[in-house]
């Protein structure tokens, strides 16, 4: 004899939903995740750190995205290990080095960087740098991205309205 259990949600004893089941019968756990993107051209001066400007939230399950301060905020509810990706498309990159540095605090150009990712000079006029990393964030951490380039003048990020993600910060909790 077969049994059928019909539910829309599986809840924790504390009352929060742990797993939602869609109309197709597939479950999607409410694992914390975020995607914040750029949608405007940003000028990056030569030889100084410049914070990535984020302009829109694509997905944000736990109010991570802080558009006012251009960062992702972590709390005691969302602390843990995340798989993160940062990416930016550049327009006419003329510098020898283009760097994206992921940091976990509000201190720019300090000792609080998770990792430095560098791109060499592009052979064409456009270059898309994309990097993925794991990091364990604590309750007071943030995720912000700083640019650095060593050209003789400013370079610009590239933003095409037809493309959904020219520049972005994303992550989801894995542990």
PLM regions and their residue ranges:
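Short, intrinsically disordered N-terminal pre-domain segments
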Residues: 1-16, 174-175
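Exposed regions on extracellular, virion, or secretory-pathway luminal proteins
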Residues: 2, 10, 79, 107-110, ...
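Terminal (often C-terminal
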Residues: 15-96, 104, 117-118, 124, ...
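Glycine-rich strand-loop-strand elements at beta-sheet edges
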Residues: 68, 104, 109-138
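Extracellular beta-strand-rich recognition modules
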Residues: 80-90, 128-131, 141-149
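Hydrophobic core residues within well-ordered beta-strands of beta-rich domains
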Residues: 98, 129-131, 167
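Beta-strand signatures of extracellular beta-sandwich domains
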Residues: 99-103, 144
